[in-house]
A protein has these predicted regions:
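Extended, structured, electrostatic nucleic-acid-contact surfaces
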Residues: 1-16
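Short, charged low-complexity linear segments at domain edges
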Residues: 25-56
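Long C-terminal interaction/binding lobes of large macromolecular proteins
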Residues: 34, 98-99, 126-132, 151-211
Length: 211
C-alpha cells in the first residue's frame, strides 16, 4: 500500500462512524473518479474549511458571524435548547416543532475520555443566561427586543445515555443559583441512544411533553 493511499485512509478514518475498512472503500471509490471531479471535491473541502465557522452566540455552523437561527427575529428568544453537537441541533430542527434558540456544548461530560466541564462551552452558556437576565438578549450582541419580558427556559436536550445524563444533571445544579427555568426532554427516548438517530415523531413527543 502506497504511503499517499495510507495517509488518505487515515484522514477519512478520523471521521466519526468511519472505520479503517470504510475509509479504505471511500479512498478506492475516489480513485475511480475522473481527476477533474477529484479536484472539484478537494476545492469544495477547502471552501468549506475557509467559509464555515462557528456562530458567536450558539456555536452552530455558520457562514456569517451569527448563524441563521440566532439572526432570525422570529425565533423565541426566551428559550435556549442545550445540545451536545451540531448534528443534534439539526435533528431537532427537522421536527419543525421547536422555534427557540440553541447552545451547542461541543460534547458531553466524560471523564474516561478526558472531557470535563471545562472542556465544554458551559461558561459561554452561563454568560448567555446572565446577559438575558440583564437585558433579555440571550447572550447575543443585538439590542433587546421591545416587550420581551418572558421567563428564560433552558431545555436540556443532551443524549439519553450516561454521558448525556451526567451533563444534564451537572447543568441543572450550576443553573439553580441563577433562578432560571430548566426542563428535560420527556422519557421515551431509548436509553443509550443518540438524538441524531431518533426519528422526528419520537423527538416531537419528547419536546411536547418535556418537564
Amino acid at each position: 500500500m502506497s504511503l499517499k493511499f495510507k495517509k488518505t485512509v487515515e484522514y477519512f478514518a478520523k471521521l466519526q462512524g468511519i472505520g479503517p475498512r470504510q475509509a479504505t472503500r471511500i479512498v478506492v471509490a475516489l480513485l475511480g473518479w475522473p481527476k477533474t471531479e477529484v479536484k472539484q471535491f478537494s476545492q469544495t473541502l477547502l471552501d468549506l474549511a475557509e467559509g464555515i465557522s462557528l456562530c458567536q452566540d450558539c456555536f452552530n455552523l455558520s457562514e456569517e458571524t451569527k448563524c441563521q437561527i440566532c439572526s432570525d427575529p422570529r425565533r423565541e428568544q426566551s428559550k435556549i435548547c442545550i445540545v451536545e453537537k451540531v448534528t443534534d441541533l439539526g435533528s431537532i430542527e427537522k421536527t419543525g416543532l421547536y422555534r427557540g434558540l440553541y447552545h451547542v456544548l461541543g460534547g458531553a461530560i466524560d471523564p474516561v475520555e478526558g472531557l470535563l466541564p471545562r472542556s465544554l462551552r458551559i461558561k459561554e452558556l452561563l454568560l448567555r443566561v446572565e446577559n438575558f437576565k440583564v437585558n433579555n438578549t440571550n447572550g447575543s450582541t443585538s439590542s433587546p427586543q421591545v416587550g420581551q419580558t418572558k421567563e428564560l427556559e433552558i431545555i436540556l436536550a443532551t443524549n439519553p445515555n450516561t454521558q448525556g445524563e451526567t451533563t444534564a444533571l451537572y447543568l441543572e445544579e450550576i443553573l439553580k443559583p441563577m433562578e432560571v427555568k430548566t426542563s428535560r426532554l420527556a422519557k421515551g427516548l431509548s436509553s443509550g441512544s443518540y438524538l441524531e438517530y431518533v426519528d422526528s415523531i419520537t423527538l416531537q413527543n419528547a419536546f411536547k411533553n418535556r418537564r
